[in-house]
Amino acid sequence: MAQIRHPLFVSITGKIDNMVFYRRNGKVFLRRLPVRKKRKPSESQLSHRRQFTAVIAFYRVLKSTFLLQVWRAAVENTLMNSCCLFVKHNCRAFDDNGKLTDYTCLRFSVGPLARPYCLKCRWLKEENAVRLTWKNNVRVGKQKTDDQLVTVIVYENDEFTVYSPQQTGAVRRDGTVTLLLPPDSSVPCAAYCFFAGVSSGFYSKDCYCRIRTD
């Protein structure tokens, strides 16, 4: 601590960088703030940070697709935002280095509607398409048979294509649909299918299926 006698500093109080000017008994004093050393993050903290960063980056990609409204619908009338909910459901799909490693833990949709059952997927190489088949739960009412199909196809190079209800053109009662893949796309490896309510604004959880390429 040092007393300041120069007239230029008589009216100064407050903090400048790591120095504090303050008055006491009509005198101005200068005191240096203690330097706080930052703790080095642990390996566990660094791993969590890499994982979290990767999931956030993945969410930002999804924001440009139809899937954004799915996650917004899931948090309606709650205190959670869509990004936090997406991170909560998808962290397990990424490893400690932030790499997507477990496709079975990847979630593209959440919601209360019934999922497709017995989902099967096959790559039609000559047609550059994927054929999907599914069954419906007998407890699904007739009014739900018009629920629209939404599909996400993931490729071996980790790219993916989102097919909105308008693009699939399929509804729950159809039980099958064939989706054309983009030209020059990589080999498809996984499909995620779920249903969107026609007027309810609700969705189902997605159903993961490994695509047969044999």
Feature-to-residue mapping (PLM):
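Long, polar/Ser/Thr-enriched low-complexity segments
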Residues: 1-117
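Charged linear interaction tracts used for macromolecular binding and regulation
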Residues: 74-214
